[in-house]
Amino acid sequence: MDNYAVWGNPIKQSKSPQIHKIFAEQTKQCMEYKAILGDPEKFETELLRFFADGAKGCNITAPFKERAYSLADEYSERALTAEACNTLKRLQDGRLYADNTDGAGLVSDLERLGWLKSKQSLLIIGAGGATKGVLLPLLQAQQNITLCNRTLTKARDLADKFAPYGNIQAMKLSEIPVQKFDLVINATSLGLQGKTVDIEPEILRLAGAVYDMQYDKGKDTPFVAWAKALGVQNVHDGFGMLVGQAAHSFYLWRGIMPDIKPLLENDLI
């Protein structure tokens, strides 16, 4: 049986093992997928041991996406552009191949929701590894992006890096203008700590739609709950993005694209 896993910290909230179990059953693949709590002090050593022991691939979640990227030997274009990965695959010669399927998962979910329109104004909150993985696909979809972060330097560096691909500007979190954005995306991991983003509430009230890249299956994330409390009508968490990126990772590993509709339309997990 082929072994796979998702690495993160925290990790107990992850639904990835259940998702990939459903994918494996659906496509008749013989594989095992588990969740592993990564040790920040030993992450690289433990991950390399995981592959040395014969594992075929893994997903990477916060806070290890950039560190995992540095361990790879080959990269997809989207991983190279992001300089962060959420997927690793062990090649036949033992080398590691890095990909980033986050952007594909987000774009497919926004399209499913009908929230991805050309040349709309998009506010992204956070400039970490999760953001790096979605900027290229969003810019390729002709989004006009305002990227904000608590520290301006990090947002500016990222905006400068992606400027050749489309319209993107950087802004400090505390200086976001109170205006209507067609879509506001929370790309921070604050929800994992039970926290939400410190921005002017009116920005969410005015938004055409609000999307949280985090999820908490069975209940609202803090960001989603806050947006709903403010009266925002179009609000969604990142479960659809999770399922979408998982499907693209599964395809990279197994060579077959699973059907995500049963997971999104039925309460399977």
UniProtKB/Swiss-Prot annotation:
One of its GO terms (molecular function) is NADP binding. NADP(+) binds at residues 77, 126-130, 149-154, 213, 238. Pathway: Metabolic intermediate biosynthesis; chorismate biosynthesis; chorismate from D-erythrose 4-phosphate and phosphoenolpyruvate: step 4/7. Shikimate binds at residues 14-16, 61, 86, 102, 215. GO terms for biological process: amino acid biosynthetic process; aromatic amino acid family biosynthetic process; chorismate biosynthetic process; shikimate metabolic process. It catalyses: shikimate + NADP(+) = 3-dehydroshikimate + NADPH + H(+). Pfam families: SDH_C (PF18317), Shikimate_DH (PF01488), Shikimate_dh_N (PF08501). The active site is at residue 65. Keywords: Amino-acid biosynthesis, Aromatic amino acid biosynthesis, NADP, Oxidoreductase. GO terms for cellular component: cytosol. InterPro entries: Aminoacid_DH-like_N_sf, NAD(P)-bd_dom_sf, SDH_C, Shikimate_DH, Shikimate_DH-bd_N, Shikimate_DH_fam, Shikm_DH/Glu-tRNA_Rdtase. Its EC number is 1.1.1.25. It comes from the Bacteria. Belongs to the shikimate dehydrogenase family. Involved in the biosynthesis of the chorismate, which leads to the biosynthesis of aromatic amino acids. Catalyzes the reversible NADPH linked reduction of 3-dehydroshikimate (DHSA) to yield shikimate (SA). Homodimer. This is Shikimate dehydrogenase (NADP(+)).
